[in-house]
Amino acid sequence: MLYLIGLGLSYKSDITVRGLEAIKKCSRVYLEHYTSILMAASQEELESYYGKEIILADRELVETGSKQILNNADKEDVAFLVVGDPFGATTHTDLVLRAKREAIPVEIIHNASVMNAVGACGLQLYNFGQTVSMVFFTDNWRPDSWYDKIWENRKIGLHTLVLLDIKVKEQSIENMARGRLIYEPPRYMSIAQCCEQLLEIEEKRGTKAYTPDTPAVAISRLGSSSQSFKSGTISELANYDSGEPLHSLVILGRQCHELELEYLLEFADDKEKFGKDVANDQEYFKPAAWVPPTEDDSDE
């Protein structure tokens, strides 16, 4: 049996009872170690808590070495641990499909992730649209496909959750080209860098999917004892020191409910200004009034 087990957001004890029971009966335990990190628990602490040795699974192992993970999983129990929820990344879906192709039984044990815990900032989950990811820009790679999804969300009034990039055990392009197994130090994108990249692409595109004055909320260390939120415009948050990782950002949609706004105001430095920014943004993205068709517009 292959168990995909969600660990939750922060602490070793965030795992469910069912998940812990599954780990204890597994002969091998892998911890996915590149899409996110457990903020308040080290590998050693997890091993002590589970009573099991943990094998760190980097991107290379999961995406190209899945045979190692699935080896003998049809005869013994293997656990694949994921920070958050098991289906928080497409890579994990691919692992399940590979297991099923090899007739290996799979059991999923869910847990909290940023996708549902984001409601802690006060925004209602059913007012969210498509989630996007913001990667670190390089000198010659500045992808902006996420821009269109933000634009689509904003047009229909929905909030956009922006997941910020992390780099764990990644190689530079030069080292990859030379075949050198030298890895870069871990990096975690800050709120300020995310907002700077948002503004750069808006200036490049010029469609005004958002502006420097668009309201947003910064989310830091969600699910930990030091979690924090900061409401402000994108330009204001581009100068915000968000502290230790991990971070996410929500760009507000046009349909910001009054209860959502009341909650967000608690995280704003200037409550009056933020309230005006939200009102101005709602007016800016206000849809045109519906005009009934005239007889000339009909097909008759």
Swiss-Prot record:
GO terms for molecular function: diphthine methyl ester synthase activity. The modification Phosphoserine is found at residues 172, 298. The keyword NADP does not apply. It is found in: Cytoplasm. Its EC number is 2.1.1.314. S-adenosyl-L-methionine binds at residues 9, 85, 88, 113-114, 164, 222, 247. It catalyses: 2-[(3S)-amino-3-carboxypropyl]-L-histidyl-[translation elongation factor 2] + 4 S-adenosyl-L-methionine = diphthine methyl ester-[translation elongation factor 2] + 4 S-adenosyl-L-homocysteine + 3 H(+). The keyword Transferase applies. Disruption phenotype: Resistance to sordarin. InterPro entries: 4pyrrol_Mease, 4pyrrol_Methylase_sf, 4pyrrole_Mease_sub1, 4pyrrole_Mease_sub2, Dphthn_synthase. Coiled coil: none annotated. Pathway: Protein modification; peptidyl-diphthamide biosynthesis. GO terms for biological process: methylation; protein histidyl modification to diphthamide. It comes from the Eukaryota. It is an enzyme of class 2 (transferase). Its main location: cytoplasm. Keywords: Cytoplasm, Methyltransferase, Phosphoprotein, S-adenosyl-L-methionine, Transferase. 2-[3-carboxy-3-(methylammonio)propyl]-L-histidine and the corresponding dimethyl compound can also act as acceptors. This is Diphthine methyl ester synthase.
